[in-house]
Amino acid sequence: MKAREVNFDGLVGLTHHYAGLSFGNEASTKHRFQVSNPKLAAKQGLQKMKALADAGFVQAVIPPQERPNVDVLRQLGFSGSDEQVVEKAGTQAPHLLSAASSASSMWVANAATVAPSADTLDGKVHLTVANLNNKFHRATEAVTTERVLRAIFKDDARFSVHEALPQVAMFGDEGAANHNRLGGDYGDPSTQLFIYGRDDSGHVAPSRYPARQTLAASQAVARLNQVNPGQVVFAQQNPQVIDQGVFHNDVIAVSNRQVLFCHEQAFAQQEKLLATLAERVPGFMPIQVPTRAVSVQDAVQTYLFNSQLLSREDGSMLLVLPQESQNHQGVWRYLSELVKGDNPISELKVFDLRESMANGGGPACLRLRVVLTQDEIRAVNPAVLMNDALFNTLNDWVDRYYRDRLTQADLVDPQLLREGREALDALTKILHLGSVYPFQR
């Protein structure tokens, strides 16, 4: 059945700030305590969504989460009114207020893992929410993520949204950032590639930075999503690249249909994996970038692989990149040669996403890929689908509510809490989501 890939992009939240919360993510650490611009961050994301929608790709939006997360601060022993809870946390434990105020839900590649209906035993689209339990500031996202996804994918006859795995290290799950799908047309049954960093049965693991995804989690997600067992491949990410700052697989590899674009050091036992995929995927085309052309360090700094690989109607592909890739002479030289070569990637499109990039999130981090048939697209909440009217409405909404300057010290401002709630209350009406936030319930 004919299907299309829909990119659901995360809208950057009002508390976007730089606090270095994500150990293992070198951009996050490098930009700690710098001044952020939430308004610019949100607009940069919206501009990417609008440009891709204008280019003919189906584009949708996922809203930010309520921050500061007052409920989690109460769980940690701060009491009083909501404003007092924020003030006490900011005074006594600013690092906890910062974590509870993180806008990290913008990176919706970590929101869930998706299985299109062509791959599932029951013929439904399945989405399993990620628990993100390796990082405190992200482990609190799952409950609201589940509510939001249920408000977008409401038709139970077509969609199944599963709650996150148990919040323990054994089942550490980072969502679609560690998942790729390889096949022919989007509507064809395809091979799902689940990538993990850690297997508790004793395989080699990274030593400097944590491996956030476990094999046990990937196996559980494949079961929950009812992926046909004959269409699943599990592969370990190279632990050496995790130790160089490749905290998710989407920092070192991206796939689209029959193409896997990756670094030659991306996976453990890479030759064996590619041979397996060649057996499973008709017309499989790996594009491996050699270290001599682009080092792992340069890939991490430029987010060359944290790109979007999108199919045009004629079968050619567009590679959507952050500006940092264009700014790096060696990386841009490689890419300029790539589009001249004998492969489907025929065009490069560059976006300025520096506000997100400074916290370690590029184009691929900002989007959740969901392959849908036309009937399934019609069953999605239509208010989240990007068009001229929604873009203008959201742009005006950002202008009305967002600050253009934010530091960690500003998070204690009770007005920021009120601004955020007022903004999100308006947003749920724009996107027809109902009461998905704690303050609305």
From Swiss-Prot:
EC top class named in words: hydrolase
Enzyme Commission number(s): 3.5.3.23
Active-site residue numbers: E174, H248, C365
Protein name (database record): N-succinylarginine dihydrolase
Catalysed reaction equations from the record: N(2)-succinyl-L-arginine + 2 H2O + 2 H(+) = N(2)-succinyl-L-ornithine + 2 NH4(+) + CO2
Keyword line: Arginine metabolism, Hydrolase
Sites where the protein binds substrate: 19-28, 110, 137-138, 212, 250, 359
InterPro entries: AstB_sf, SuccinylArg_d-Hdrlase_AstB
Pfam families to which the protein is assigned, alphabetical: AstB
GO biological process: arginine catabolic process to glutamate; arginine catabolic process to succinate
SUPFAM superfamilies found in the cross-reference section: Pentein
HAMAP family linked to this entry: AstB
Annotated gene: astB
Pathway assignment: Amino-acid degradation; L-arginine degradation via AST pathway; L-glutamate and succinate from L-arginine: step 2/5
GO molecular function: N-succinylarginine dihydrolase activity
Quaternary context: Homodimer.
Protein task: Catalyzes the hydrolysis of N(2)-succinylarginine into N(2)-succinylornithine, ammonia and CO(2).
Family note: Belongs to the succinylarginine dihydrolase family.
